[in-house]
Amino acid sequence: MSAVAIMTTHVAFQTGIDPHSHIGAILGRFDYFLAVFFAFSAYLLWRGMDFHRGMLVTYFHRRFWRVVPGYWAYVVVALALVPEAFGASWVSVLSTLSFTQIYLPEGFLGGMTHLWSLCVEVVFYLVMPLLGWALRNVGPAKRIMVFCGLALLSLGWAFLPVVADSPREHVPNMQIFFPGFFCWYAVGLIAAEVEELRRRRGVMDKPVKVFQYRWAWWLVAFFAMWLAGQEFFGPVGLEHPSAGEFALRVIAGTVMCACVFLPYAFHSAPSFLDWRIISYLGRISYSFFLWHLAVLGTVLPLLGIRPFTGGFLVVLPLTFIGSFIVGSCGYVLVEWPFRSARAAKLTLLRIFR
């Protein structure tokens, strides 16, 4: 769901949907579904984590094979086929391959600007075991308090002088570093701890009534996106926000994320997420996300549509279909065969024997 929503906001931008219109304001903030992805990632990883040395080896092994093969495959193909990436310096290539491009000024390569979020996600993978180790002897209730405190502190990230003064010459945009988005991860971390509290109290299978009306929470989520897309709330489009505007943007994303994520985490009623096609989309969502920008960059010239000149209703379904097909290929040819070290070894043996 998050991958499709992020694709939609990119299509809306590239086809010139007016961000000052009501629908444009909402579509422009569909990037808040990234917050849902961050929260879901934190929720799944935190609740399944056992913080001892043996588990850490398994944890990092799984994270590497889950993320890196598909990412490297996309970067290599994009470097070879996306014109905007031609002539990239070795520094840019190596930083992109190592998830460190956000730490370089002008570090983004054409067709790969969306990968910044994976740089943030990789830092979370590194930070999470440290956080778990520090809180290993603390109960769920106190962990929730810690996460709430850290989330509040993270809202001050953009106000730090060194961050507020970026980006500038030879300095990257530090607003998009991991601390700036901890609130979004905190939603998932807190949800995991609340789940543990419910398990200990024997009410794990009892739905949380406040979340039974999911449609109402969706309305709040859409209102949060609409509000964040208004000029009085902060700049629209690619204009760099001030520290206060960035903090407001993160808060709105946190509200939207909680409204979308929590009703499904704490109320197990049937939903559209149970449909087979949605389950399959979830399976290929990583490759779908990786490749959708390249697909969009191909669809526009094939249709003879110049950027920012319209065609949203034509470009959107074609970009979805193309991303679905390429994402499926990425999953079948890269993600699944290279899902673990053992699987990768067997795959390479089949290829080169």
Task: For every predicted segment, state its role.
Residues 4-28, 46-58, 84, 104-106, ...:
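Alpha-helical transmembrane segments in multi-pass integral membrane proteins
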Residues 43, 47, 65-91, 259, ...:
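Specific transmembrane helices
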Residues 30, 36:
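Extended basic-aromatic, gly/pro-enriched interface segments that bind polyanionic ligands
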Residues 68, 72, 76, 126, ...:
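Residue-level signature of the transmembrane alpha-helical core
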Residues 90-99, 293, 298:
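Short hydrophobic, aromatic-rich alpha-helical segments embedded in or entering the lipid bilayer
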Residues 3, 35, 41, 68-72, ...:
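Residues within membrane-spanning alpha-helices of integral membrane proteins
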Residues 82, 99-158, 178-182, 196:
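Hydrophobic alpha-helical segments with transmembrane-like composition
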